[in-house]
């Protein structure tokens, strides 16, 4: 289990992980790592939240929010934001399904992708600032948001098909079963309940689950399935929806 965690941490983040810690794990077994996604999100969110807390007293909530979001982007290497941009470029191109998938593979940033990046990053900064002004616990909120967003991404993997012939998303999409999905969502729910007691966190998670489920169905209808890019988009939007639901 520890090898699986370190392998997933290395796979979906840019945090330094010694190779020997995940050595011997076959790539085809990575799908079992979905259950570690909420824990990895918890770690990323906690680090980002600590940055906010350290900087808030020095430069105020808005700049602290800016740098906490920046740290989150750096820790993931912009991996999920890239998926969000590619997804928006493809889906909003209003082309044929095959052409949409082709556009999503293009490394160049389009207008729709650029606008999506600006909106999501700016919205996160503003929501974090507002939560801080309302006296909400930012460390707990960010840790929960990152855990829940990565946990609910399982909704785009379970009983979905991969929209392409090959790619990194094929490791997870259509490869996880009902038990793994339930365990992943259950862990995310536990983190939400513990970090944000009084059902506030669980209620925000339910809102996020509904939003991500609807997103998955819309993408399935538009693209014929999911890709690694759509998983990244779901994680980014899941973080934002969860934080908005806390307001």
UniProtKB/Swiss-Prot annotation:
Signal sequence, start to end: none
Catalytic activity: alpha-ribazole + adenosylcob(III)inamide-GDP = adenosylcob(III)alamin + GMP + H(+); alpha-ribazole 5'-phosphate + adenosylcob(III)inamide-GDP = adenosylcob(III)alamin 5'-phosphate + GMP + H(+)
Membrane topology summary: Multi-pass membrane protein
Co-factor requirement: Mg(2+)
Annotated compartments: Cell inner membrane
Transmembrane segments: 34-54, 59-79, 113-133, 138-158, 194-214
Gene Ontology terms: biological process: cobalamin biosynthetic process
Gene Ontology cellular-component annotations: plasma membrane
Keyword tags: Cell inner membrane, Cell membrane, Cobalamin biosynthesis, Magnesium, Membrane, Transferase, Transmembrane, Transmembrane helix
Principal location listed in the UniProt entry: membrane
Associated pathway: Cofactor biosynthesis; adenosylcobalamin biosynthesis; adenosylcobalamin from cob(II)yrinate a,c-diamide: step 7/7
Pfam families tied to this protein: CobS
Its EC number(s): 2.7.8.26
GO terms of molecular function: adenosylcobinamide-GDP ribazoletransferase activity; cobalamin 5'-phosphate synthase activity
Database matches in InterPro entries: CobS (IPR003805)
Role noted for this protein: Joins adenosylcobinamide-GDP and alpha-ribazole to generate adenosylcobalamin (Ado-cobalamin). Also synthesizes adenosylcobalamin 5'-phosphate from adenosylcobinamide-GDP and alpha-ribazole 5'-phosphate.
Family classification: Belongs to the CobS family.
Protein name: Adenosylcobinamide-GDP ribazoletransferase
Primary gene name: cobS
């Amino acid at each position: 289990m520890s090898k699986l965690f370190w392998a997933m941490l290395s796979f979906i983040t840019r945090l330094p992980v010694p190779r020997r810690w995940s050595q011997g794990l076959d790539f085809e077994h990575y799908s079992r790592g979905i259950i570690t996604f909420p824990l990895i999100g918890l770690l990323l969110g906690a680090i980002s939240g600590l940055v906010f807390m350290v900087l808030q007293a020095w430069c105020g909530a808005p700049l602290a929010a800016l740098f906490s979001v920046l740290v989150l982007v750096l820790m993931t290497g912009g991996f999920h934001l890239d998926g969000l941009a590619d997804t928006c470029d493809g889906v909003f191109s209003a082309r044929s399904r095959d052409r949409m998938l082709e556009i999503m593979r293009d490394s160049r940033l389009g207008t729709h992708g650029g606008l999506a990046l600006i909106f999501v990053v700016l919205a996160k900064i503003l929501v974090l600032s507002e939560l801080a002004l309302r006296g909400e616990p930012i460390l707990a909120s960010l840790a929960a948001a990152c855990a829940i967003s990565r946990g609910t991404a399982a909704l785009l993997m379970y009983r979905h098909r991969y929209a392409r012939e090959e790619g990194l998303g094929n490791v997870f999409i259509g490869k996880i079963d009902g038990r793994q999905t339930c365990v992943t969502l259950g862990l995310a729910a536990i983190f939400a309940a513990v970090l944000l007691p009084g059902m506030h966190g669980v209620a925000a998670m339910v809102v996020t689950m509904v939003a991500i489920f609807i997103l998955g169905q819309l993408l399935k209808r538009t693209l014929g399935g999911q890709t690694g890019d759509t998983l990244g988009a779901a994680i980014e939007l899941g973080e934002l929806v969860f934080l908005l639901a806390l307001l």
